[in-house]
């Protein structure tokens, strides 16, 4: 019998030996040795119902069998005739067959592999063995089911997509962020080889061929410079930093960064040396950090020869780190990878001085190696006209304090001519992401996977940066949550609208507010020697050149936007990571194609997730069409806007189906591309069998009514101001600009009735009466929130009057603008008295603080600390290979006037940013897609009613708090020795009226 038992025990392999490890224990751990016998599990079941074991369970039944067998064991120790010793197989098995767990702990701590025990249990009969075997097999099934329930389930989707697709896109995203420059350099190397072998250069686009022609000599010159640095023959201060990247990557970064600046330089084809050097130096340092890390973590056999003498333990540690990084990369644990990169990179930051020195030297080498040759229309017997592509010159700029000179890099006119075709060949960093951004966890933890990402754009303001870093993370949770919500909104390209844009652009622009792709021809020089004619000609030439510069700048801007659109158009969707300015307003980190941009950007972007229109969605689409069509239609009641769209159904269908071949009704809109996108969406819905079930991807906008004044009216509980900016219900939206224009007209009519002999403004009033409308005063009313000055208002109104050409004499035009500006500001003060008093109070408090040489600080309702960055700038001179550069650095002295004038608008912007973020969080909790553009909130057509309810509730919640009282208290706590003015008097406006106002946002 015992031989049979032994045979049973040894004839089977132990199964499920890994079960214990899966649950956190190994059979060699200390916990394992202290486990209690199996019957403890059955005892547990009576006190721990979570285990799901009853007295009739398999565990209980087998426990009774085991107790029977244990009795045999005990008997064997007393009765040596049984032939079992304490060291026998059965004894050892008896000791191993255990389950651990604390009595009453509420959870199963460890499950031993019962298959292995079953194969070793002894019995007094074969029937016992068979019965136990059956029980064990049954129990193993229960064990597997229990383990499955205990193990954490892997998510089936991440970011709304399958795990496999997500991981694939994430790998692509990592490649985009870490290998962009390397891929560009590789492309140039391959093009050079192709050109040598197959003569492909003539087939390349113009700017691509220029880049290719500059690349090889620039790369070789950088390599030669690096060799001098290595040999110690170059004693330049930049030498230690010059060889940290391969020459080909430095060449590509230098070309692309400089050309990018030239493209965005206002159409002049020039870039300031200090700006260009800083941009190039920063890009080189960042890429060097990634390159250095990747080199460090290579396998030991790939390390360079100077590591042969490295001690073995260091080599092992490096190999360990490399393997760890590799595993983490496979698991997509990018946060841990970034942390390791930071820990392993023991290099100190280069510092601004060294950055600009490296940048200047690279620019200098590019200037020495990059040449351009005009097209082959020169005479055969003339030497070829080969000239430098870039030159370094000095520009003089006249300022109020005198003239200033600064160095610029100027490109040749032939290079400038090709700039607006360059975007498609540029490496554009901070592209929209293919996967949801990393959640924000700290000042520099979130958004992009590898690219440096900071939650706030501090622009070198140290105090603001430190203030954000010092705040407990818990305090910033609402801010993190709001930014994550904005970043997780998935977008895609509207390919139909993009196709129309491409057709218009390919045919020369000039439609739908797209700039003409051709320059205005310069006027011919007159033959006459008349000085007046020559002066007139020069004036015309100057105007044409200015116009062409503006066109060039707009062309570059459109090309950059379209370059991004073309790269992203085949993607199912993409995301815009967001961060904040110092006031707490949220912005997409990608700068070119985003929903904060122009009508072009907004027209070709849509939500990647579609939703059925539902009962209200089609109505909101019609309202949205009227809003983007504009021309006064957007000021009608909702019913009026719906009627406008329904009256233009034929135009809508024609625009959607034949946008360029038909009547082109959509081109008459103020926002033509958004109008076209809406026409297409409405046409699709109306053509479908059931419009309510038609899927819409279009974001519908709800915009505040002069939102800054809405916030001031709420702060001051101003009844009159609240009515002017739609905080109270009305039959149609109140138009604050028309309201101010009406007041201005009343004042001017009173003045016009006076005796001109006693008041010089009488004639000006009579002249301007017919010119007063909402357009004349709109910009001044809008900027009143930002503390517009009398001079600012005068210049704004002067521009409007000059456009109309009513007053030709410059002196009279200036005088009329002065009078109109004073009148407009008077009307504003009358209508928004509470806003004016709050602005004055905020400015007075700021002045008191700034006079003590302290910046103004406050904390937004969402817990974000704000420090105004306005300090006097000091000059710091750096000698570089190009020129002596003047770097500006903050001093300890604050700018009192700027601190005072900027505080009121900055404070209100921090409040509108808080309102937007509160709305974003609430929309996410309600399952809505949400995008925000400061005072414009977007969601699907079917969800507009719900979003409207949320944004009103959040506005009331925001201003139910004692905001001004809290601000004054924080000032008094920070500066107990200073005397602050009392809070301004406020009105009796009931905030809850906002909840019933249909046009608060509309």
Swiss-Prot record:
Zinc-finger as UniProt keyword: no
Gene Ontology CC entries for this record: mitochondrial DNA-directed RNA polymerase complex; mitochondrion; plastid
Function: DNA-dependent RNA polymerase catalyzes the transcription of DNA into RNA using the four ribonucleoside triphosphates as substrates.
Enzyme class: transferase
EC id: 2.7.7.6
Tissue specificity annotation: The highest levels of expression are detected in the mature leaves. The level of expression is lowest in the cotyledons.
Protein name: DNA-directed RNA polymerase 1, mitochondrial
Family stated for the protein in its record: Belongs to the phage and mitochondrial RNA polymerase family.
Molecular function GO labels: DNA binding; DNA-directed RNA polymerase activity
Compartment(s) where it occurs, according to its Swiss-Prot or TrEMBL record: Mitochondrion
Keywords attached to this entry: DNA-directed RNA polymerase, Mitochondrion, Nucleotidyltransferase, Transcription, Transferase, Transit peptide
Pfam families: RNA_pol, RPOL_N
Catalytic activity: RNA(n) + a ribonucleoside 5'-triphosphate = RNA(n+1) + diphosphate
Active site: 703, 778, 935
Stretch forming the transit peptide: 1-21
GO biological process: mitochondrial transcription
InterPro entries attached to this UniProt entry: DNA-dir_RNA_pol_helix_hairp_sf, DNA-dir_Rpol_C_phage-type, DNA-dir_Rpol_phage-type, DNA/RNA_pol_sf, RNA_POL_N_sf, RPOL_N
Organism of provenance: Nicotiana sylvestris (Wood tobacco)
Domain of life: Eukaryota
Coarse class of the protein's main subcellular location: mitochondrion
């Amino acid at each position: 019998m015992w031989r049979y038992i032994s045979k049973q025990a040894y004839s089977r392999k132990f199964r499920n030996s890994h079960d214990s490890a899966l649950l956190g224990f190994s059979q060699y751990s200390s916990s394992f040795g202290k486990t209690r016998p199996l019957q403890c599990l059955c005892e547990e079941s009576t006190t721990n119902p979570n285990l799901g074991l009853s007295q009739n369970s398999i565990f209980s039944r087998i426990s009774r069998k085991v107790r029977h067998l244990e009795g045999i064991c005990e008997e064997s120790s007393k009765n040596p005739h049984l032939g079992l010793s304490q060291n026998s197989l059965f004894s050892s098995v008896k000791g191993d067959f255990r389950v651990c767990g604390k009595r009453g702990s509420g959870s199963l701590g460890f499950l031993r592999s019962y298959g292995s025990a079953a194969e070793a249990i002894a019995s007094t009969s074969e029937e016992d063995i068979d019965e136990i075997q059956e029980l064990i097999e049954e129990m193993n099934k229960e064990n597997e089911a229990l383990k499955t329930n205990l193990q954490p389930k892997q998510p089936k989707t991440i970011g709304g997509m399958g795990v496999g697709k997500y991981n694939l896109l994430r790998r692509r995203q990592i490649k985009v962020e870490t290998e962009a420059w390397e891929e560009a350099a590789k492309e140039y190397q391959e093009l050079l080889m192709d050109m040598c072998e197959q003569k492909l250069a003539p087939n390349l686009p113009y700017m691509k061929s220029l880049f290719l022609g500059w690349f090889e000599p620039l790369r070789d010159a950088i390599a030669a410079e690096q060799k001098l640095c290595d040999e110690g023959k170059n004693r330049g201060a930049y030498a230690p930093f010059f060889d940290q990247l391969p020459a080909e990557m430095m060449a590509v970064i230098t070309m692309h960064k400089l050309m990018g600046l030239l493209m965005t330089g206002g159409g002049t084809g020039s870039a300031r040396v200090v700006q260009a050097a800083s941009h190039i130096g920063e890009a080189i340092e960042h890429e060097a950090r990634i390159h250095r890390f990747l080199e460090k973590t290579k396998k030991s056999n790939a390390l360079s020869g100077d590591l042969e003498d490295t001690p073995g333990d260091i080599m092992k540690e490096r190999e360990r780190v490399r393997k760890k990084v590799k595993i983490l990369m496979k698991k997509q644990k990018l946060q841990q990878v970034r942390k390791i990169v930071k820990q392993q990179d023991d290099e100190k930051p280069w510092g601004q001085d060294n950055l600009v020195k490296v940048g200047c030297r690279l620019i200098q080498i590019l200037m020495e190696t990059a040449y351009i040759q005009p097209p082959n229309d020169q005479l055969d017997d003339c030497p070829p006209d080969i000239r430098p592509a870039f030159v370094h010159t000095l520009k003089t700029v006249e300022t109020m304090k005198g003239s200033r000179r600064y160095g610029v890099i100027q490109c040749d006119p032939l290079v400038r001519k090709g700039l607006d075709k360059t975007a498609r060949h540029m490496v554009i960093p901070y592209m929209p992401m293919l996967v949801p951004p990393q959640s924000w966890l700290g000042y520099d933890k979130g958004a992009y996977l590898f690219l440096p990402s900071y939650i706030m754009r501090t622009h070198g303001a140290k105090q603001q940066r430190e203030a954000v870093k010092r705040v407990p993370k818990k305090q910033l949770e609402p801010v993190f949550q709001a930014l994550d919500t904005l970043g997780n909104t998935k977008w895609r390209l509207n390919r139909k609208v993009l196709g129309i844009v491409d057709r218009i652009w390919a045919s020369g622009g000039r439609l739908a507010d797209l700039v003409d792709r051709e320059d205005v021809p310069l006027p011919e020089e007159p033959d006459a020697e008349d000085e007046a004619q020559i002066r007139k000609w020069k004036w015309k030439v100057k105007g044409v050149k200015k116009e062409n510069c503006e066109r060039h700048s707009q062309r570059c801007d459109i090309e950059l936007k379209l370059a991004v659109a073309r790269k992203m158009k085949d993607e199912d969707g993409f995301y815009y990571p967001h961060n904040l300015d110092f006031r707490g307003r949220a912005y997409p980190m990608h700068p070119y194609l985003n929903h904060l941009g122009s009508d072009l950007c907004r027209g070709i972007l849509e939500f990647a997730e579609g939703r059925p229109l539902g009962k209200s969605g089609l109505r909101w689409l019609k309202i949205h069409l009227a809003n983007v069509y504009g021309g006064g239609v957007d000021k009608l009641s909702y019913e009026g806007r719906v009627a406008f769209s329904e009256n233009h159904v034929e135009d809508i269908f024609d625009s959607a189906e034949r946008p360029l071949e038909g009547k082109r009704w959509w081109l008459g809109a103020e926002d033509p591309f958004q109008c076209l996108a809406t026409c297409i969406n409405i046409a699709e819905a109306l053509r479908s069998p059931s419009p309510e079930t038609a899927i819409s991807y279009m974001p519908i906008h709800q915009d505040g009514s002069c939102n800054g004044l809405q916030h001031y009216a709420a702060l001051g509980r101003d009844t009159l101001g609240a009515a002017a900016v739609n905080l109270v219900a009305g039959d149609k939206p109140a138009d604050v600009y028309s309201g101010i224009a009406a007041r201005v007209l009343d004042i001017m009519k009173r003045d016009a009735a006076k005796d001109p002999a006693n008041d010089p403004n009488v004639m000006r009033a009579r002249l301007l009466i017919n010119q007063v409308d909402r357009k004349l005063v709109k910009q001044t009313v809008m900027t009143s929130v930002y503390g517009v000055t009398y001079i600012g208002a005068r210049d704004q109104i002067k521009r409007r009057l000059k456009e109309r050409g009513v007053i030709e004499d410059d002196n009279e035009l200036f005088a009329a603008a002065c009078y109109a500006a004073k009148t407009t500001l008077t009307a504003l003060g009358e209508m928004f008295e509470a806003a004016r008093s709050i602005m004055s109070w905020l400015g007075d408090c700021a002045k008191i603080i700034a006079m003590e040489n302290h910046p103004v600080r406050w904390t937004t309702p969402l817990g974000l600390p704000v420090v105004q960055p306005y300090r006097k700038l000091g000059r710091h001179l750096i000698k570089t290979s190009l020129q002596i550069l003047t770097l500006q650095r903050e001093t300890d002295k604050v700018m009192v006037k700027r601190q005072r004038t900027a505080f009121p608008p900055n404070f209100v912007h921090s409040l509108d940013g808080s309102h937007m973020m509160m709305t974003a969080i609430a929309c996410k909790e309600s399952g809505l897609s949400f995008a925000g553009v400061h005072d414009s909130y977007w969601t699907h057509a079917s969800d507009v009613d719900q979003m409207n309810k949320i944004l009103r509730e959040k506005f009331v919640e925001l201003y139910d708090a004692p905001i001004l009282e809290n601000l004054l208290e924080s000032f008094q706590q920070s500066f107990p020795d200073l005397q602050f003015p009392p809070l301004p008097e406020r009105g009796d406006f009931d905030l809850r009226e906002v909840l019933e106002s249909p046009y608060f946002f509309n």
